[in-house]
């Protein structure tokens, strides 16, 4: 397997040069209105719309859209992106950018550049096709965009499968395209109609997959085109929702011609007119493209870094932010979404605020939360409240938006309360939902979805440490807003919990913290059956501050001995070899996969943050590089990981060693952002400003970070000189705190 491609010079795009890869190289394009398309390096992919109530309309699945060209003189048909026809094109490249995907190739002297983007507004995607004739004779080409759709997501019977059909696909002159209209009452006025339109003359069209595709009607074999036929210009009232256009163009030698197409969903033809208005001119299309890029660029510019590691620069400046935004649209779960928002606080505080509101609206009056809201999962996971507290405090530090605490948000089970009340109810739930050791109950599971202890009184050391961290954060917040008595109460509770954890959760023989208790037995201790140590109690002991000074090096040593591997940090060690119903799903997973003894990147991300919190940037950097895709220990040839996004896990099972799990959908993205900006560079959020305490890797002698906050640009320059100092706009500081400013620009110079 060859090298699949390379980053652009500024890191905002990845150029794929290998047509066939271990897994499809996907890009994700989306907008605030809920439109989302996931594109492969072939220009194919899935598209969907998520509505405000979280219902999702699946427009089409992977394999549901294609672009074909046919040389009308030779009859040759091909796909410029290779798939779905497996076309033998030359000079193939795919540029996955932040906001677009462009596929380029050449076939028999005809080069094609095929760009897809999602405008900043509207439920639509735009395809731009540029064709250049490199031959010395004129040619005539048919350009055929084709979509085989689902348009499903509503609840109720699928009316289009009934004898009385409930939709029709027609060609509408005023749209210059095909229009799919549903009369299904279950759509409830939501945009389940669709339109596919062209910028220029449409010579033929089709609304019938049976007339265009050979059985079983896949886009792999466009029967009509391959047999010299044109599209049948038919109306369809049966079969699968389908739309195709055929536009014929004559191109002289050396000439380039352009066509634009738009695919979108709507409620009616009036809305369809607005969707296709983007095609009024090439200038209009490019204006929409620039608007989309400008919105993305604004997000990118709010936090920018420059370090000696280009790959880390690319990830922090572009790909982590993009990944977290995508995950917020793709996932709907308390823990997951709050951690994505955690990583976006500096670059998109308004998104973090909206996510907090949404999560709180799925919190019960007693303080606990649902696991996810789409689909709704009310299974009792114990860690929900701690993410609400940690992320809200993080947001308040950065924004100083204390009025947010007074805002009222509904509870999931009725009634409403202020944001502050929601925080306090979450803390109260964790403080009172305790087991025999006065530790937090594990309930069905905590952060580790697969650790399902069957004892109703089972306790989670992880959640208990998380509660300790929350108590610290709440104490600082209460002090900041003048509620000193509550601040003192939370401080006292923190100290009491710290003592409880250190008395009950320390494994004297192994010299590390255990994972929990169930049926009177220790989980994750030296005497435990199956797995004897877990990563999270060691890392969260540091993150929460509960580890005592004399135990810090001991847990570091234990982690190095059992948890740290060439691939990253194991969730647990050793992996459970046999199924243990009392332990749960984790023991049913094959050893060395997912949560059972694999390298779970989220757990490694906790580890690197714990390392930088201890001031050990070098150790954190070493571990971070392991979970970065295409690393020295897991190069692309081994892992198959997408080079521009983090993955969920790496297998340690000998049969699939180093292979990856799912790309994009991992909570480790927010924690990597935090590690680099607040750890390596040391620019930590605080009430009223930043604390600056860098912990750069040993071979980083200089780094920069630019942060835009409320109209002020903060420029941090960190240099390794052997002398510690901080100057703000040339004035030497006696402390490491940099206050927020209303100036246009603040320059902070740090030496270490």
Give, region by region, the residue ranges found by the protein language model.
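Inter-helical turn/loop segments and adjacent helix faces that build the functional surface
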Residues: 269-270, 398-411, 473-489, 614
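Secondary-structure capping and boundary motifs in well-ordered enzyme cores
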Residues: 118-123, 253, 330-336, 348-351, ...
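Anionic coordination/interaction segments
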Residues: 1-335, 350-358, 362, 394-398, ...
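Carbohydrate-binding/catalytic loop surfaces
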Residues: 369-387, 412-414, 437-460, 510-534, ...
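Beta-rich accessory regions
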Residues: 120-147, 189-190, 199-209, 252, ...
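Aromatic-lined, polymer-binding surfaces characteristic
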Residues: 302-305, 309-318, 322-337, 359-386, ...
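Aromatic-rich carbohydrate-recognition surfaces in CAZymes
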Residues: 68, 344-440, 460-468, 597-620, ...
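Catalytic cores of carbohydrate-active enzymes
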Residues: 144-146, 161, 370, 466-583, ...
């Amino acid at each position: 397997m060859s090298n699949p491609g390379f980053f652009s010079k500024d890191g905002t795009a990845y150029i794929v040069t290998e047509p066939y890869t271990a897994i499809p190289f996907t890009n994700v394009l989306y907008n605030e209105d809920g439109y989302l398309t996931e594109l492969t390096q072939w220009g194919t992919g899935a598209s969907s719309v998520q509505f405000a109530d979280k219902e999702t309309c699946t427009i089409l699945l992977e394999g549901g859209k294609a672009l074909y060209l046919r040389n009308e003189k030779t009859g040759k048909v091909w796909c410029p992106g290779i798939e779905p026809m497996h076309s033998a094109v030359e000079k193939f490249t795919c540029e996955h950018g932040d906001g677009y995907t462009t596929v380029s190739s050449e076939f028999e002297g005809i080069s094609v550049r095929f760009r897809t983007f999602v405008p900043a507004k509207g439920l639509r995607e735009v395809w731009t096709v540029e064709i250049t004739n490199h031959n010395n004779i004129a040619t005539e080409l048919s350009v055929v965009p084709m979509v085989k759709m689902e348009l499903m997501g509503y609840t109720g019977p699928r009316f289009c499968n009934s004898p009385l059909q409930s939709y029709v696909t027609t060609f509408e002159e005023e749209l210059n395209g095909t229009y799919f209209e549903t009369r299904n009452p279950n759509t409830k006025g939501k945009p389940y109609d669709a339109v596919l339109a062209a910028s220029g003359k449409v010579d033929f069209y089709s609304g019938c997959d049976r007339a265009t595709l050979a059985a079983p009607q896949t886009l792999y074999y466009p029967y009509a085109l391959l047999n010299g036929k044109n599209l049948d210009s038919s109306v369809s009232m049966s079969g699968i929702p389908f739309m195709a256009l055929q536009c014929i163009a004559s191109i002289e030698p050396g000439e380039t011609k352009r066509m634009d197409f738009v695919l979108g969903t709507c409620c009616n033809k009036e809305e369809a007119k607005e969707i296709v208005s983007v095609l009024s001119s090439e200038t209009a299309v490019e204006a929409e493209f620039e608007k989309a890029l400008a919105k993305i660029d604004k997000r990118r510019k709010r936090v920018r870094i420059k370090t000696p590691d280009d790959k880390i620069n690319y990830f922090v400046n572009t790909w982590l932010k993009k990944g977290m935004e995508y995950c917020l649209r793709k996932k709907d779960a308390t823990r997951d979404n709050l951690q994505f928002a955690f990583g976006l606080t500096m670059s998109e505080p308004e998104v973090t605020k909206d996510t907090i509101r949404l999560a709180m609206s799925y919190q019960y009056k007693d303080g606990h939360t649902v696991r996810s809201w789409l689909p709704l999962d009310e299974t009792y996971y114990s860690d929900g409240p701690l993410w609400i507290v940690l992320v809200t405090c993080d947001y308040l530090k950065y924004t100083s938006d204390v009025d947010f605490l007074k805002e009222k948000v509904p509870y999931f089970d009725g009634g409403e309360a202020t944001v502050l009340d929601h925080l306090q109810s979450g803390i109260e739930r964790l403080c009172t939902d305790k087991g025999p050791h006065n530790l937090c109950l594990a309930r069905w599971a905590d952060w580790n979805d697969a650790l399902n202890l069957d004892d109703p009184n089972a306790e989670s050391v992880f959640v208990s440490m998380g509660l300790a961290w929350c108590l610290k954060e709440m104490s600082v917040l209460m002090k900041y807003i003048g509620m000193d008595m509550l601040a003192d109460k939370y401080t006292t509770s923190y100290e009491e919990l710290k003592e409880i954890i250190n008395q009950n959760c320390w494994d004297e023989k192994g010299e590390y913290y255990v994972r929990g208790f169930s049926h009177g037995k220790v989980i994750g201790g030296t005497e435990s059956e199956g797995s004897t140590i877990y990563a999270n109690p060691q890392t969260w002991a540091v993150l929460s501050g509960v580890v005592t000074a004399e135990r810090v090096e001991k847990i570091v040593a234990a982690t190095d001995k059992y948890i740290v591997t060439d691939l990253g940090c194991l969730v647990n060690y050793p992996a459970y070899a046999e199924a243990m119903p009392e332990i749960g799903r984790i023991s049913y997973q094959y050893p060395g996969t997912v949560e059972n003894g694999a390298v779970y990147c989220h757990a490694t991300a906790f580890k690197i943050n714990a390392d930088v919190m201890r001031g050990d940037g070098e150790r954190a950097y070493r571990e971070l590089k392991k979970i970065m895709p295409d690393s020295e220990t897991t190069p692309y040839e081994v892992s198959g990981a997408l080079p521009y996004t983090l993955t969920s896990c790496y297998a340690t099972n000998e049969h699939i060693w180093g292979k990856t799990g799912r790309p994009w959908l991992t909570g480790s993205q927010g924690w990597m952002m935090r590690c680099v900006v607040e750890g390596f560079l040391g620019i930590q959020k605080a009430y009223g400003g930043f604390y600056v305490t860098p912990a750069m890797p040993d071979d980083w002698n200089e780094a920069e970070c630019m942060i835009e906050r409320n109209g002020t640009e903060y420029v941090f320059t960190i240099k390794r000189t052997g002398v510690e100092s901080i100057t703000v706009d040339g004035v030497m500081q006696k402390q490491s705190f940099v206050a927020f400013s209303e100036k246009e620009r603040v320059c902070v110079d740090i030496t270490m």
